[in-house]
C-alpha cells in the first residue's frame, strides 16, 4: 500500500506551486489551509531518496514527548535546531508531551469510551503566551481531535504552521504514534488522519530538495514498516516509562 506516499508527493507538488511569501524576512513558498488526508492502515512514515528522513530521530522525538519533561534537553543530541529554540529558562514549548500526557490523553480515551459519538475528545496544545514575539520556540499545533465514526477512529491535527520538508513528516509520525496509543485503548477499526495546516511551506534553502522529490516521483519512495502498541505499552508511554523490553512496539521505537 502506497496511499500515504502518494498523498505526500501531491503535497510537495502543491506547496511548490504555492505563493512566495517572506515571514520574518525568510523567503518560502506556501499554500494556506491545506488538508493532507492519510490512511491509518498504511505506514505513517514517508521518505523519499531526495530527502532521506531519519526515522531514528523521529522515534527519539516521540520518546522525548512521552517523557513529558519540558526541561529535557536530550533531544539536542539528535537535532541541533532544538538548541537554537530552547527558551532562556532551559525549557521547550514544543515538547508536546507536556500538554498531552497524562491528563489530556486519558480525557480523550475516557470521553470516547463513555460516548463513542462524542465531539469533545480533543487535546489542546497552543496557548496564547506561546505567540509572544520574544519567544524562540512557538508551538506549531493548535489541537488534536479524535472521533469515532462508522466504527472507525479518525484523528484531525490542526496546525498553524508546518515546514513540509522537515516538519510535516516528523509531526505525522509522532501524531500517528499518539493515534495508535489511543486506538489501543478502544474497540474500533482503523480510520483516517487529517493533517490540516494554515501555512504549509518550504523554505528557499530547500527549493532544490523539493524539486528533486517532485522530479523523482514515486520511484524515490522508500517504505518503512512500523508496529502498533499493546494497551500496556501505550500506558507505559503515557507515563513516560516505556522501556525496550515492554513489547514489539517499544523495542522498535528504541532501535
Per-range role (PLM):
Residues 1-255:
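Terminal, non-catalytic protein-protein interaction segments that mediate quaternary/complex assembly
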Amino acid at each position: 500500500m502506497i496511499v500515504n506516499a502518494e498523498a505526500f508527493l501531491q503535497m510537495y507538488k502543491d506547496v511548490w506551486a504555492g505563493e512566495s511569501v517572506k515571514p520574518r524576512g525568510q523567503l518560502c513558498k506556501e499554500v494556506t489551509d491545506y488538508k493532507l488526508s492519510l490512511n491509518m492502515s498504511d505506514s505513517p512514515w514517508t521518505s523519499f531518496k531526495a530527502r532521506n528522513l531519519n526515522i531514528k530521530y523521529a522515534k527519539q522525538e516521540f520518546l522525548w514527548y512521552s517523557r513529558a519533561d519540558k526541561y529535557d534537553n536530550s533531544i539536542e543530541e539528535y537535532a541541533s535546531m532544538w538548541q537554537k529554540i530552547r527558551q532562556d529558562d532551559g525549557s521547550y514549548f514544543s515538547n508536546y508531551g507536556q500538554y498531552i500526557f497524562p491528563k489530556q490523553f486519558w480525557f480523550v480515551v475516557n470521553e470516547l469510551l463513555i460516548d463513542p459519538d462524542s465531539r469533545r475528545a480533543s487535546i489542546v496544545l497552543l496557548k496564547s503566551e506561546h505567540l509572544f514575539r520574544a519567544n524562540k520556540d512557538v508551538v506549531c499545533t493548535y489541537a488534536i481531535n479524535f472521533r469515532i465514526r462508522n466504527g472507525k477512529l479518525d484523528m484531525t491535527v490542526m496546525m498553524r504552521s508546518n515546514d513540509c520538508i522537515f516538519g510535516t513528516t516528523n509531526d505525522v509520525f509522532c501524531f500517528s504514534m499518539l493515534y495508535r496509543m489511543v486506538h489501543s485503548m478502544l474497540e474500533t477499526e482503523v480510520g483516517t488522519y487529517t493533517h490540516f495546516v494554515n501555512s504549509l511551506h518550504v523554505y528557499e534553502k530547500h527549493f532544490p530538495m523539493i524539486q528533486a522529490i517532485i522530479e523523482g516521483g514515486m520511484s524515490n519512495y522508500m517504505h518503512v514498516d512500523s508496529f502498533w502498541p499493546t494497551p500496556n505499552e501505550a500506558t507505559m508511554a503515557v507515563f513516560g516509562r516505556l522501556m525496550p523490553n515492554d513489547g514489539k512496539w517499544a523495542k522498535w521505537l528504541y532501535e
